């Protein structure tokens, strides 16, 4: 028996409402802290989602590049079947210039968008939701 296509009109909410499952991620607002050899830059991660594996519908946390390195290593160990994309490369000169910081911010955002967009990681990773949502995320707990 063949089923007929659904010909009813969609409501305004169905057309323009939030998608069934969505996850938006943004890396923004880099801030440089400290002086001299103790300087570092961290980045704000904004996450909006309705995926049940994530405890919060909206969250904002700050992470350093070194946190992203640990996070990526944990993902690789945790998810052997998934190829984890590379992070933007390390920078050794002018690493606190606006251009370098903006390039790194864009690279970290691209990395996170790929990672959070992967269905196996969205539902199977133990570290993903914590990294993008928990302000007290501890790299040593993994």
UniProtKB/Swiss-Prot annotation:
One of the GO BP terms on file: endocytic recycling
Coiled-coil zones: none
Compartment annotation: Cytoplasm; Golgi apparatus membrane; Prevacuolar compartment membrane
Entry-linked Gene3D superfamilies: Phox-like domain
Alphabetized UniProt keyword annotations: Cytoplasm, Golgi apparatus, Lipid-binding, Membrane, Protein transport, Transport
Reported function: Required for retention of late Golgi membrane proteins. Component of the retrieval machinery that functions by direct interaction with the cytosolic tails of certain TGN membrane proteins during the sorting/budding process at the prevacuolar compartment. Binds phosphatidylinositol 3-phosphate (PtdIns(P3)).
PANTHER family linked: RE52028P
Family statement drawn from the similarity comment of this UniProt entry: Belongs to the sorting nexin family.
Protein name as it appears in the record: Sorting nexin-3
Organism: Neurospora crassa (strain ATCC 24698 / 74-OR23-1A / CBS 708.71 / DSM 1257 / FGSC 987)
Gene: snx-3
């Amino acid at each position: 028996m063949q089923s007929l296509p659904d010909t009813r009109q969609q409501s305004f909410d169905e057309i323009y409402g939030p998608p069934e499952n969505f996850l938006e991620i943004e890396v923004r607002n880099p801030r440089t802290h400290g002086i001299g050899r103790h300087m570092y830059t961290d980045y704000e991660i904004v996450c909006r989602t309705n995926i049940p594996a994530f405890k919060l519908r909206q969250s904002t946390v700050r992470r350093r590049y070194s946190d992203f390195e640990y996070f990526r290593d944990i993902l690789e160990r945790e998810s052997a079947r998934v190829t984890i994309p590379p992070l933007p490369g390390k920078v050794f000169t002018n690493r606190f210039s606006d251009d370098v910081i903006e390039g790194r911010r864009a690279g970290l955002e691209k990395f996170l968008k790929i990672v959070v967009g992967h269905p196996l990681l969205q539902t199977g990773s133990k570290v993903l939701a914590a990294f993008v949502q928990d302000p007290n995320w501890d790299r040593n707990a993994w």
